[in-house]
Design a protein with these regions (language model features):
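A conserved glycine-rich beta-strand in the N-terminal activation segment of trypsin-fold
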Residues: 11-14, 35-67, 98, 180, ...
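N-terminal Sec signal peptide cleavage junction
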Residues: 7-9
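Flexible, gly/ser-rich surface segments that form the specificity/activation loops bordering the active-site cleft
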Residues: 12-15, 122-178, 194-205
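C-terminal cap/linker of serine protease catalytic domains
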Residues: 11-17, 85, 122, 190-245
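Catalytic-histidine neighborhood of serine endopeptidases
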Residues: 47-49, 55-107
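Catalytic nucleophile loop of clan PA
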Residues: 53, 173-194
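A short, Trp-centered hydrophobic/proline-enriched beta-strand micro-motif
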Residues: 18-40, 138-140
Length: 245
């Protein structure tokens, strides 16, 4: 059994949230686009933000989880090729900045694994050993609309509604910027990763199903641990790109 999976007991809400918020990550993505044609080049910079959290820490850095659409770098096909470079900056709860790389991404289920070199000695979010049941109380810690400051991140309480098809449904408030944020049970264990919200009713959100999240993290942590002793983080980025789900 991996140490990233939990068998903890329920603690008071303020204790659970106080510990979990230490694992929060604020993500900023910058994409530089360049398209050349007719003897001229056009360049544009796109910026976006999202949420994430630490799932495992090592002596050299930490693994983080966010939504796959945050990690996606695909572009529509055009008659003139578009060059693009994406960079990710991660800020911890206390305001320390790091660079991150994408290791694995499951677009279908909208979940992504990143690696943050140098982010050490940080609490991690454990994964629940059991999936939630409809009616269970859940907590969400994220940065809707980019609402975040050092040592301040919004926290919400909601309810698990059930699952259908690829999705798990939760009653929680969300907005752009909430993508990739943790959904926890009352023990502070991971049960969901928020990736979508109903635009006309932003109090109902979607996550990948618990079993999908559980397997994605388990499988990709194993892959990373297998390769990391002989390859650099940048080389690993290429390895995982060849093993996308």
């Amino acid at each position: 059994m991996f140490s990233i999976f939990s068998c903890g007991a329920t603690a008071p809400k303020n204790v659970v949230l106080g510990q979990a918020r230490q694992s929060f990550l604020y993500l900023e993505k910058k994409v530089v686009l360049e398209q050349c044609g007719d003897h001229r080049c056009l360049k544009q910079e796109l910026n976006s933000m999202a949420s994430g959290f630490v799932i495992k820490a090592t002596p050299d850095g930490s693994y983080g989880i966010t939504a796959a659409h945050v990690c996606d770098t695909s572009l529509p096909q055009t008659s003139t090729p578009i060059k693009h470079v994406s960079t990710y900056t991660v800020t911890s709860l206390m305001g320390d900045e790091y660079k991150a790389v994408v290791l694995a991404s499951d677009i279908k289920n909208d979940i992504c694994l990143i690696y943050i070199k140098g982010l050490i000695n940080i609490p991690v979010i454990k994964i629940s050993n059991t999936e939630p049941k409809p009616g269970d109380t859940v907590y969400n810690i994220g940065a809707p609309r980019g609402i975040y400051q050092p040592n301040m991140v919004p926290m919400f309480e909601g309810v698990y509604n059930g699952k259908a098809s690829l999705y798990a449904f939760y009653s929680l408030p969300a907005n752009p910027g909430s993508s990739g944020s943790m959904i926890l049970n009352e023990k502070g264990e991971l049960v969901g990763v928020l990736h979508s919200v109903y635009v006309k009713f932003p109090q109902v959100v979607l996550s990948a199903r618990y079993d999908v999240i559980h397997e994605f993290i388990r499988k990709n942590i194993i892959k990373y641990e297998t390769y990391k002793s002989v390859m650099s983080v940048l080389e690993l980025k290429d390895v995982f790109a060849a093993h996308k789900l």
